[in-house]
Amino acid sequence: MQPEEIMSFRDHATMSSIVNESTSVNHGLMHSSANNQHSAILFDNITECPGHRASMNILTREHLCKVWSLSPGELIDTMGWAMDNPCDPVIVEPEKAECMQNTMAIVDVTSIPVPWHYEQDRGRYMSASVIIAERNGERNMSFHRQFVAGKNRLVARLVPRHLRQFTDEARADNEILNIAIINGADPCVLLAAAMSFNERIDELRVAASLHLKVYGKPLRVIRLSNGVHVPADAEYAMQAVITGEDDEEGPYVDITGTVDDIRHQPVIQINQIHHRNSPI
């Protein structure tokens, strides 16, 4: 595969070492990662989730620099350029989107390989997924960990950034907040979602600019039925709402190794789960 052809998340994931042994979402993914020095891994046989796959340690700076033929400094400069030059993604019809190849008949987020990494954690967490929210002509795209509290119920840790503002504003108006939860988006989307801005910038437009700069091709998105736009080639696209309810979230071992406290945080209700064939 040529560098210009390596665009989707699965293009990168399938370049990893493949683990074919049955691996459990309950501590098994983390144990296997540790045993492999936290190198890039693709798990092809998830005990609790037949037909679904999982990956870890894929999109490192070293990997992206190699695939994109950029030095670390050039990668930072490219990201800075995209911030300064956001552009619109291209909207395509849902039937042309890989993420719409399958829709769960009954929503059950426990049937996809969401891991329980550390024994101290409250349970299974989506910690590498992106939330996209749209309200009153504004959009936010950012990372937030989400505790799996039921088949269609999550509790999200919302720190005081822009998605928290969107949520508080919707609640002040006695409204729900329409969102999408994305797993396995391409690196341009994930990098943009990880950026931090003081002002309420549309990170999806930054992702579109980065995608055009890196690949020379526009970022394709679709519009879900709740009005939220998502990357067309994402592995999973969940249509959801942030409700007016709060519930317990945590404890959780965060990126620093510190066990984060229990807090009351917003509840997310998942209404639909779309995914690619043999999703990662």
Regions found by a protein language model. Give the residues of each.
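Extended, highly charged
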Residues: 1-252, 257-267, 271-280
